[in-house]
């Protein structure tokens, strides 16, 4: 990549390509696909999302024991959350696309090779996370296929209600297993995108904040400039900071409610999967299949909490940069403008879900403790039922 030409939106290209395949990012109406995209979107989402959700939900309602209920809940609840996330992306699509223009505007404000290197490092980090999640999901799907192949009796990757008799005939079983696995592969693609796109946006916001901090820290050093010129440069940096804050608030609006539901969903999934693995009678392949699912669901929330802390960390660096610039030798008007920027930088860039819950590693720890508490409660219920 040419260091003189940095495009932050490059990190988002794969995400929006997948969203187009998922049926929520229509192309131009002049193309053949664009004219028929609505029908395509309906067929895709009904086939791969609604049908699989109905089968998971009906299977959950037909549970006749605590073990089967836990096994069904740990796939039904996350899938329901992913459908809500997909609807939310469709609802906020216009605002998210418009943020690309703001990112390109910030790209044009980069002033030196060091700043461009910061943005490039952020893009590479986002792409690395995307590839890592892809590999993890691919391993999970492959393990599920191995589990199906190695099973001594007809089975599917995850507990699902099928409205026809698929166990008595080899041909019916093979057709059902292929359809079910194909649907889960499509959903794995959806999970890949919904798990990684928030982190990509948050990383881009954080690296642009870091680049701005580098620019601000250099203010007043080097060759002396007229007071009017210094004020104009500072005003430009204040505008850059306002753009970053607009991006951050846009992300918060896009992610707030679904992130709140994700904490609850992940805690429930951790609790139910652990209960099923600890107290259910499962073979080694089934155990590994559910264990990989647990790792994927936990990693998704861990990644969200980690990337949500990056803008806050770089916001603190920007505050330090304001103090570090050579403001002592500047004019009174410059200092007044700097005080305005300083006041805004003192407000931490903390992403909040559901109005009150901060998205952070501390919240992730609280979620783990909540899952353990629920697991303890389920264990007490199990002991009571055995007595």
Curated annotation (Swiss-Prot):
The chain crosses the membrane at residues 41-61, 72-92, 128-148, 172-192, 255-275, 286-306, 337-357. InterPro entries: 7tm6_olfct_rcpt (IPR004117). GO terms for molecular function: ionotropic olfactory receptor activity; odorant binding; olfactory receptor activity. It is found in: Cell membrane. It is a multi-pass membrane protein. Its main location: membrane. Residues 1-40, 93-127, 193-254, 307-336 are cytoplasmic. GO terms for biological process: detection of chemical stimulus involved in sensory perception of smell; signal transduction. Keywords: Cell membrane, Membrane, Olfaction, Receptor, Sensory transduction, Transducer, Transmembrane, Transmembrane helix. GO terms for cellular component: cation channel complex; dendrite membrane; membrane; plasma membrane. It comes from the Eukaryota. Belongs to the insect chemoreceptor superfamily. Heteromeric odorant receptor channel (TC 1.A.69) family. Or2a subfamily. Odorant receptor which mediates acceptance or avoidance behavior, depending on its substrates. The odorant receptor repertoire encodes a large collection of odor stimuli that vary widely in identity, intensity, and duration. May form a complex with Orco to form odorant-sensing units, providing sensitive and prolonged odorant signaling and calcium permeability. Interacts with Orco. Complexes exist early in the endomembrane system in olfactory sensory neurons (OSNs), coupling these complexes to the conserved ciliary trafficking pathway. This is Putative odorant receptor 19b. It comes from Drosophila melanogaster.
